[in-house]
Swiss-Prot record:
Family, as annotated: Belongs to the cytochrome c family.
Protein name in the entry: Cytochrome c1 2, heme protein, mitochondrial
A matching Pfam family: Cytochrom_C1
Keywords: Electron transport, Heme, Iron, Membrane, Metal-binding, Mitochondrion, Mitochondrion inner membrane, Respiratory chain, Transit peptide, Transmembrane, Transmembrane helix, Transport
TM annotation in the entry: 271-288
Species for this entry: Arabidopsis thaliana
GO cellular component, one term: mitochondrion
Transit peptide residues according to the UniProt entry: 1-64
Chain ranges of the Cytochrome c domain: 90-197
InterPro entries associated with the record: Cyt_c-like_dom, Cyt_c-like_dom_sf, Cyt_c1, Cyt_c1_TM_anchor_C
Coiled coil residues, start to end: none
UniProt topological domain (Mitochondrial intermembrane) ranges: 65-270
Length: 307
């Protein structure tokens, strides 16, 4: 009896301790869950803040990169960029007219001769007449002196300045580049030149351009010494084409593209001829492989060994 009473007392104490511990454990578990939820919310908020900060910093870096290297210019459908496409020679002639009347006062094309224009934009008589309009310093003569003479087809297009120092002095320290290879010397050359010529605009709010420079987002740094040169009706085309800003930009870029790659049409034609000849050679090789060599390759020799 005494042993049974002791056992019952021990059981009651154990049950009582479990009943007291259960609310405590539930309170601790709920507290831990609340703390986990709060820490998860803080982590999510921190990640969101880091993402927003990263986006803002990325946009800032992108804006700084555009300001430093120039705005990325769009791609335009130039008609001579096709595999078998050729230059628009009427556009080249108009582009040369734009170069003569607008660009030649500052920019040179020292790699182009008048004879290069024959058969491309002008007849031989027209090119000779243009060359005769300039005076070229030549010599020495029999007396050892230099002299001037009318230009010939073999002469290069005239340069506006005698040297780089004179060019910089006339342009406020800026040096106008030679345009002979400009579409190959610039990244995305044709599109860049067209976007640069037609991309002048007023500077946005908060950007100041110092005196003597002009805002152009396509030029590295956004400030260029060359003013806007292409304006509607600035040139009167010989063929009556409306001389809009976009038309003049397209024509002068066509002329500069030809100047940089005058052999493009011949290269494309030669490539087409080689592809045609190699295709015939491939067909002939396939014929001999299938009907001649395969017969020899599959032939078996039988040796009759006589004992």
């Amino acid at each position: 009896m005494v042993g049974g009473g002791v056992i019952r007392q021990l059981l009651r104490r154990k049950l009582h301790s479990q009943s007291v511990a259960t609310p405590v454990l539930s309170w601790l578990s709920s507290k831990k869950a609340n703390e986990d939820a709060g820490s998860a919310g803080l982590r999510a908020f921190a990640l969101m803040g880091a993402g927003i900060t990263g986006l803002l910093s990325f946009s800032t870096v992108a804006s700084a990169d555009e300001a430093e290297h120039g705005l990325e210019c769009p791609n335009y459908p130039w008609p001579h960029e096709g595999i078998l496409s050729s230059y628009d020679h009427a556009s080249i002639r108009r582009g040369h007219q734009v170069y003569q009347q607008v660009c030649a006062s500052c920019h040179s094309m020292s790699l182009i001769s008048y004879r290069d224009l024959v058969g491309v934009a002008y007849t031989e008589e027209e090119a000779k007449a243009m060359a005769a309009e300039i005076e070229v310093v030549d010599g020495p003569n029999d007396e050892g002196e230099m002299f001037t003479r009318p230009g010939k087809l073999s002469d290069r297009l005239p340069e506006p300045y005698s040297n780089e120092s004179a060019a910089r002095f006339a342009n406020g320290g800026a040096y106008p580049p030679d345009l002979s290879l400009v579409t190959k010397a610039r990244h995305n050359g044709q599109n860049y030149v067209f976007a640069l010529l037609t991309g002048y605009r007023d500077p946005p709010a908060g950007i100041s351009i110092r005196e003597g420079l002009h805002y152009n987002p396509y030029f590295p740094g956004g400030a260029i010494a060359m003013p806007k040169m292409l304006n509607d009706e600035a040139v009167e085309y010989e063929d009556g084409t409306p001389a809009t800003e976009a038309q003049m930009g397209k024509d002068v870029v066509s002329f500069l593209s030809w100047a940089a790659e005058p052999e493009m049409e011949e290269r494309k034609l030669m490539g087409f001829k080689w592809i045609f000849l190699l295709s015939l050679a491939l067909l002939q090789a396939a014929y001999y492989r299938r009907l001649k060599w395969s017969v020899l390759k599959s032939r078996k020799l039988v040796l009759d060994v006589v004992n």
